[in-house]
């Protein structure tokens, strides 16, 4: 097994888009979820109104990876994906197949081994990213081609199994959304004739989080907008730390049952909402609103309501756009209309979701085990 510069094993490709008629799908770095496109986060653009970063065209067989430091996003381009426009925040490459199997190159670019070197060699004053000069510093171990093909076949098999697990997770989420509509109907048409109110009528306390910056080695864990998923889950796999005076803690810490509303983000992500379901004390960041509800509504019901497709459309229409971000402030959030089914029916929905979450947990565990196996194989060959 020999060592080579990674640019010996791949060629940087991609170009600027030619003028086109009608609309195309624009895929930003934020629209790629690790290894697949989340179409809920894409935009339809024309040639003339596309964002300045929507300036990368690709071909079938290319591989994309995000240039940004600390970002794991890798995409294999098939025929349908080749029709889209991509952000210049991606680097497009193609395998030098005399040295590197194309399928294995994809897995390598998604591996911890590559990402570690990418981050070490990234540069930039504000947002660090890998450049061509940085790529020239990355050295990898290269097995012979027959060994590469065997490894790629094993990794592809693991990926297929992981994809099936992810499909199961999506199905569980859709099941919960369908059950919500079945029990309560859509809003504002309110076909079941429930009592209506505004969020202001059902809250006991509404506060912004702290505007203080995260610090290395801070005393408290810091819950930020990135810890709320688009689907309405709490994800604490990547948390920061913060120092904050004791007299400010009560105003900006979270407790079990708090509803967390992301007030500032890109336009498509404003309004992401989840319920804090942990006992650990965490400090809340300022781009998130902490909502404590009255007994008229269950926190899980309010969160599910704000994460429905009809609420997502409403939030998209009401948020105020600024350069690079959009916003819904606390007063505007409280003006949102809502229906109020009986709490017993709300509880029935919450129990259904809890049972579904248990099934999701089992699938997620299987997914984690496959991820460990995949990393073990990559470590064996490239570590």
Where do the model's predicted regions map?
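Short coil/turn segments at secondary-structure boundaries
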Residues: 19-26, 120-122, 192-195, 212-219, ...
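Non-catalytic DNA-recognition/assembly elements of restriction-modification systems
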Residues: 1-19, 137-153, 164-208, 335, ...
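A generic structural signal for short beta-strands and their flanking turns/coil linkers
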Residues: 23, 87-89, 219-221, 238, ...
């Amino acid at each position: 097994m020999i060592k080579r510069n990674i640019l010996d094993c791949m060629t940087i490709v991609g170009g600027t888009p030619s003028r086109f008629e009608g609309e195309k799908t624009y895929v930003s770095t934020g629209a790629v979820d690790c290894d697949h496109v989340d179409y809920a986060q894409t935009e339809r653009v024309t040639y003339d109104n596309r964002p300045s970063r929507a300036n990368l065209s690709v071909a079938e067989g290319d591989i994309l990876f995000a240039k940004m430091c600390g970002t794991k996003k890798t995409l294999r381009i098939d025929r349908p994906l080749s029709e889209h426009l991509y952000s210049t925040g991606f680097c497009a490459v193609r395998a030098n197949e005399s040295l590197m199997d194309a399928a294995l190159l994809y897995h390598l670019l998604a591996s911890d081994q590559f990402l570690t070197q990418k981050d070490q060699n990234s540069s930039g004053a504000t947002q660090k990213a890998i450049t061509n000069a940085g790529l020239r510093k990355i050295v990898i171990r290269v097995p012979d081609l027959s060994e590469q093909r065997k490894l790629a076949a094993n990794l592809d098999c693991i990926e297929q199994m992981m994809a099936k697990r992810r499909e199961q997770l999506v199905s569980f989420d859709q099941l919960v959304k369908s059950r919500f509509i079945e029990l309560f109907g859509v809003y504002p048409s309110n076909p079941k004739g429930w009592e209506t109110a505004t969020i202001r009528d059902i809250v006991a306390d509404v506060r912004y989080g702290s505007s203080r910056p995260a610090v290395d080695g801070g005393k408290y864990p810091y819950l930020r907008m990135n810890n709320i998923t688009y689907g309405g889950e709490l994800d604490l796999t990547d948390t920061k730390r913060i120092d904050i005076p004791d007299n400010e803690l009560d105003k900006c810490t979270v407790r079990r049952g708090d509803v967390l509303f992301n007030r500032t983000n890109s336009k498509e992500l404003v309004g992401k909402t989840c319920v804090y379901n942990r006992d650990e004390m965490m400090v809340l960041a300022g781009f998130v609103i902490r909502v404590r509800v009255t007994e008229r509504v269950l926190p899980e019901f309010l969160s599910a309501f704000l994460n429905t497709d009809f609420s997502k459309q409403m939030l998209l229409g009401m948020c105020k756009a600024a350069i690079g971000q959009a916003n819904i402030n606390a007063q505007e959030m409280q003006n949102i209309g809502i229906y109020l089914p009986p709490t017993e029916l709300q509880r029935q929905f919450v129990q259904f979701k809890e049972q579904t979450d248990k099934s999701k947990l089992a699938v997620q565990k299987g997914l984690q085990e496959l991820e460990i196996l995949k990393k073990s194989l990559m470590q064996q060959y490239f570590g």
